[in-house]
Design a protein with these regions (language model features):
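N-terminal non-globular leader segments, chiefly Sec-dependent signal peptides
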Residues: 2-5, 25-28, 52, 105-112
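N-terminal secretory signal peptides
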Residues: 1-42
Length: 112
């Protein structure tokens, strides 16, 4: 999968689970993601995804996770966390991701 942010393309892999398969069915997909906490961008769908949440002690830059069964979150910084998510996938090489993500809301394109 490719994740395109501001003209920069990142290679990513999806997990082998029901939530990631549902996301893959929506590709190609272009969404406006909202900035949160200086470390993530999120988009809330109007539908629920299958979820199998587990607690993440550390979130890594490039993690693509599902929160609360309907919110896709792309993390662009690594930090400690106590929240639970379902893993959707990850960017293979997140170098340059913080710069591409910037400080505000962004348009993100997901492609096969």
């Amino acid at each position: 999968m490719k994740i395109i942010i501001g003209g920069k393309t990142f290679d990513a892999v999806l997990e082998d689970n029901a939530a990631a398969k549902k996301l893959a069915e929506k590709l190609p997909l272009e969404i406006s993601m909202t900035e949160l906490n200086g470390n993530e961008k999120y988009f809330r769908f109007n539908e629920r995804f299958p979820s199998n949440d587990s607690r993440f002690a550390t979130i890594h830059a490039g993690d693509l996770l599902l929160w609360s069964s309907n919110t896709v979150v792309l993390f662009y910084k690594t930090f400690s966390s106590g929240y639970s998510y379902t893993r959707l996938g990850k960017i293979l090489n997140p170098a340059g991701l913080p710069a591409a993500a910037g400080n505000g809301n962004i348009l993100v394109r997901f492609e096969k």
